[in-house]
Amino acid sequence: MTENYIPRLKTRYQDEIRTKLQGEFEFENVMQIPGVTKIVVNMGVGDAARDSKLINGAIEDLTAITGQKPQLRRAKKSIANFKLREGMPIGAKVTLRGDRMWEFLDRLLTVALPRIRDFRGLSDQQFDGHGNYTFGLTEQTMFYEIDVDKIDRPRGMDITVVTTAVTDDEGRSLLRELGFPFKGEDGNRQQ
């Protein structure tokens, strides 16, 4: 990225969203205004215990989606029922921060989520009590970076958005302002 480029969503957060949140929650200090710290994208590949080539597909997909090489996750303990031994690769994860994080969030909200068939919005009940939000996607084909003809199998992923919000209400308000399409009480998307 060039030196003077600032991601679109980051600019919107700094110019509009911070002021709205300050007015909504009446923070005394600007450092109390919630922001996004990092995004963790995790892809678990449990079948990699039987076929080690499957983990390579997950790594390639995550690299294409996030633009960053994923970290290989290995099993911490052996579990005989799953035919799993300690140290076997069972997943991959990427931690995005800074401009890459803002770009990924922008692509996720404007391109990927609207491409999901029969998408009615994300549940707003998946906060962890400290303003962090985790949701899962069932397949990786909704991202334009993935060539549908070249994928060997559909893989789901978990995406965690870590914020500096203290409560779930602050985190929910921040993500709603950023453009997260949360479901309403009736199960349909809120406007």
Swiss-Prot record:
A GO cellular-component term linked to this record: ribosome
SUPFAM superfamilies named in the record: RL5-like (SSF55282)
Pfam families on file: Ribosomal_L5, Ribosomal_L5_C
Gene3D superfamilies linked to this entry: 3.30.1440.10
Keyword Glycoprotein: no
GO biological process: translation
InterPro entries: Ribosomal_uL5 (IPR002132), Ribosomal_uL5_bac-type (IPR020930), Ribosomal_uL5_C (IPR031309), Ribosomal_uL5_dom_sf (IPR022803), Ribosomal_uL5_N (IPR031310)
Keywords for this protein: Ribonucleoprotein, Ribosomal protein, RNA-binding, rRNA-binding, tRNA-binding
GO MF annotation: an example: rRNA binding
Family membership: Belongs to the universal ribosomal protein uL5 family.
Role according to the record: This is one of the proteins that bind and probably mediate the attachment of the 5S RNA into the large ribosomal subunit, where it forms part of the central protuberance. In the 70S ribosome it contacts protein S13 of the 30S subunit (bridge B1b), connecting the 2 subunits; this bridge is implicated in subunit movement. Contacts the P site tRNA; the 5S rRNA and some of its associated proteins might help stabilize positioning of ribosome-bound tRNAs.
NCBIfam families noted in UniProt: PRK00010.1
Stored HAMAP family: Ribosomal_uL5_B
Quaternary state and interactors: Part of the 50S ribosomal subunit; part of the 5S rRNA/L5/L18/L25 subcomplex. Contacts the 5S rRNA and the P site tRNA. Forms a bridge to the 30S subunit in the 70S ribosome.
Protein name, UniProt field: Large ribosomal subunit protein uL5
Organism of provenance: Corynebacterium glutamicum (strain ATCC 13032 / DSM 20300 / JCM 1318 / BCRC 11384 / CCUG 27702 / LMG 3730 / NBRC 12168 / NCIMB 10025 / NRRL B-2784 / 534)
